[in-house]
Amino acid sequence: MSNIGSYEERCKTFNWKISEDELGYKKGDVINIGEYCTDRICRMGKGEKLALIWQGHSNEIKKYTFNEMKVLTNTIANYLQKLNLTSGDRICLFMDKVPELYFGFLGILKMGGIAQPLFSAFGGESLFTRLDNAKTKAIITQRKHLKKIRPILKDLPSLEYIIVVDD
């Protein structure tokens, strides 16, 4: 099942030095988790390994390698930067658990944004409260969720962009 053993075993043998060596991380290093989860794996020569296996409600399966994840997450990060979104900007992910959710999350982290994943079943009031309190600048969503976003737009002065990931 797992090559890491039980939780109890890992607690007994855990050592930060081993983890630092394994991850290539040294105390005080600054890392970008988005880059760390994709680009670093590719640089290690493991780009063709599977990074994500997604299964939809109709049992549709999509598989993505680390190389594909790197390209997709970099594409999102670059697009967000072209919109003049910058490090520290809050960017909401308001969508179902589709592959774009994961690409978007890592892409936001890569460009230095603050990823704000929100439960896609939220209604207008719950969505508004979170977007308003966070001063969210952009929202990445699916077309089917626009009906929840449109009625609250006029009351969200910080929200500059709505990015729809499907047709």
Where are the regions a protein language model picked out?
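Acyl-group handling in specialized metabolite and lipid biosynthesis
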Residues: 21-31, 55-64
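Generic alpha-helical structural signal
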Residues: 32-35, 70, 74, 150
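Structural core segment of the AMP-binding/adenylate-forming
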Residues: 2, 82, 106, 110-167
